[in-house]
Amino acid sequence: MSRFMHFYKSPVPLVLQAHKKNCLVYTNLRTRRLRLLAQLNQREKELKNQDFRVGHEKVINTIDEIRTFLVDNHDDIIESIDGVIRTLRDIRPNEQVSSSTTTGHNNTTGTPTQSVVSGTGAVTGTGGTSSVAPDANMVADKTVTITMADKPFEYRDSFRDEFIATMYNATLRSYTMGDWYSKLKQKIYDEERYRRRFKVTHPESPAISYELVCGQVQILDLVTVYPTTDIVITDIQSAICILWTLYNGILNTTLDLSVTFEEVFEKVPGMLDVLEAEIKKENGNTTLFGTYSFADNEDIVFYNPPKDKRYSPRTFENNVIVRLLYRLRCIQNMPNDPLGAAAQSNLGIGWDEDRLFRVCRKLLTGIVQDVPIFLHKQYYLRSGCTCISALLYVKCFLDSTSVFSPSDRKFSLDTFLPNANTYVDASDYRGRNIKNFSFLWKKYVTQLYKDRPSITFSGIFPGAVLFSIAYSVSNNWLGPGHVQRPHPNARTVKLQLLHNQPLYSYLWVQHRVPRHPLEVLKAHDRALFYFEYGIHLLLNQPISFTTHRNTLKRQFNVTDVYELCYFFVLGFVPVELII
């Protein structure tokens, strides 16, 4: 064996770390590259998120600016849209006249033109001779009359809106509308956004701006309009059905189902006379005293029960109208009476035997497809009874004095309508058989309903709603559940909350940006509760103008029944302010 190894054999085995240089260096570079790419992607995402947040904030700010602009310039925008609509209406008949004239001219060389009848006129031509009939699609002027001492008013779209516009366009002078509107102006002046929205300046001045009047009248119009989609008939329509059922029951006549809704609508003053006489007969005196409100729970928030369409037990138990319906057998049992409902079910009596449902099914044909059952969907029963109570109060109040009686009134249509020529003479005073409400119903209410069948009580008499709510507040009523009136001989004096202003709260949430529908519904229902209980309080007072004359004169510039008619219709009485 040789002591030396061959040259090609290494005497010491080489042991090297695997991939010591190349692969490890390559791995470090790859990891660093991946780390840098991840950081770059993360930074890119952060920049995108930052740009998104900035863009989102810009969009939100832009939306808020648009909302503020729309709220502040709502009336101007609506007026501009109405102006465009009126312009288009005026252009359309002119185009038809031009086309008709051109057609007649082209027919001069041909056969004689035929006779064309459309609407109330006709176009008859032979050869080149033609006479153009008025367009049947033209919107005719509508007329309403408020009192027997005035001329009729002509309007195109909305009587109240056009009356306000005419009043403020007539002169450059300002108008005052009583202490109530002055207090409202002072409250709004403290809010900068509403101050700009309603153009409120100089809070110490009693002058009321055009924007503030329109905003408040709009709120009054919405008090009895329930802002949910499940309401299919109005309070006026519900009241007409209940009134016709009571009218036939009081007179002990066979239920007349051969009439239409429009025919019954025109008979409302006579039906209210019969109802008034029946309530006075039941009371045994000449008053209408009774319970016209409803026994709600203290925790009630919404006027319309949201779940099962029923109110709590005994809500309708003491109401005068509902008890009269039950006494005359117009309804089979009292609402929410399980014993009566079970007894009727055991006897096999269905809804076809219910007189009120039969009347609703007949009168509401063509108005609504699915006629509601008032004892099930009790909102209609409650709103209808409240509307009847309100109509009864308005009728008795307006018929307490003649519009021709002399007074020291300051309101005059001649101030802004030079051709009004109001005829009021003391020699024409009639103390008996006063029919102010019947005249107003025929010349004003009926015309408004024909023009807009969806109108409600607050849209017809916003002033009555305003006075009712103000009367509830002045009597220290705190809302549903607090139904006890302060007794004159009580040992304690009941105080009221400082911010007990339901109409101002409703106005505030209605024009707030952004608007919260639930808060709007709560404020609306609170105002509706106050209106309902105010009617109850007013009907439990002697119904005459002298009873509330001082309050009406101080709060709303109403000095006699003539001005009261305009106050109920307009929601205000403007008196020219001379500085």
Curated annotation (Swiss-Prot):
| Sorted UniProt keywords | Capsid protein, Host nucleus, Host-virus interaction, Viral genome packaging, Viral penetration into host nucleus, Viral release from host cell, Virion, Virus entry into host cell
A Gene Ontology biological process term: viral penetration into host nucleus
Q: What exactly does this protein do?
A: Capsid vertex-specific component that plays a role during viral DNA encapsidation, assuring correct genome cleavage and presumably stabilizing capsids that contain full-length viral genomes. Participates in the interaction between the capsid and the tegument through interaction with the large tegument protein/LTP.
Task: Report the source organism.
Answer: Elephantid herpesvirus 1 (isolate Asian elephant/Berlin/Kiba/1998)
Identify one Gene Ontology CC term for this UniProt entry: host cell nucleus
The gene behind this protein is CVC2
**Annotated segments matching region Disordered:** 92-134
Quick one: where's region Interaction with major capsid protein/MCP?
1-46
Subcellular compartments: Virion; Host nucleus
Q: What is this protein called?
A: Capsid vertex component 2
Asked if the Swiss-Prot or TrEMBL record annotates the protein with the keyword NADP, the reply is no
Biased-composition ranges for Low complexity? 101-121
| InterPro entries attached to this UniProt entry | Herpes_UL25
